[in-house]
Swiss-Prot record:
Residues 21-97 form the UPAR/Ly6 domain. It is found in: Secreted. This is Prostate and testis expressed protein 3. The gene is PATE3. It comes from the Eukaryota. It comes from Homo sapiens. Belongs to the PATE family. GO terms for cellular component: extracellular region. Disulfide bonds join C23-C50, C26-C35, C42-C68, C72-C88.
């Protein structure tokens, strides 16, 4: 019985590890296409997606921000002469490719 339980537990851990969503993190990516702060990879938890926030001023990309985000949803809004574009996705490293 214990061997079967251990086998099933290891199989479950392997499946979870293989199917976990991986996202790029970058807390400050500049127009020169370079991450200045927080570059890495996060593993999305339950209910999280990969998120990319792009901030434009006069239709020119100023900075972007990438992270694992809970309650992520696609949206665009304008505030103080800037346009904020939130984009969410659900496959590995997708927030870097958008």
């Amino acid at each position: 019985m214990n061997k079967h339980f251990l086998f099933l537990f290891l199989l479950y851990c392997l499946i979870v590890a293989v199917t976990s969503l991986q996202c790029i993190t970058c807390h400050l990516r500049t127009r020169t296409d370079r991450c200045r702060r927080g570059f890495g990879v996060c593993t999305a938890q339950k209910g999280e997606a990969c998120m990319l926030l792009r901030i434009y001023q006069r239709n020119t990309l100023q900075i972007s921000y990438m992270v694992c985000q809970k309650f992520c949803r696609d949206m665009t809004f304008d505030l103080r002469n800037r346009t904020y574009v939130h984009t969410c996705c659900n496959y590995n490293y997708c927030n870097f490719k958008l």
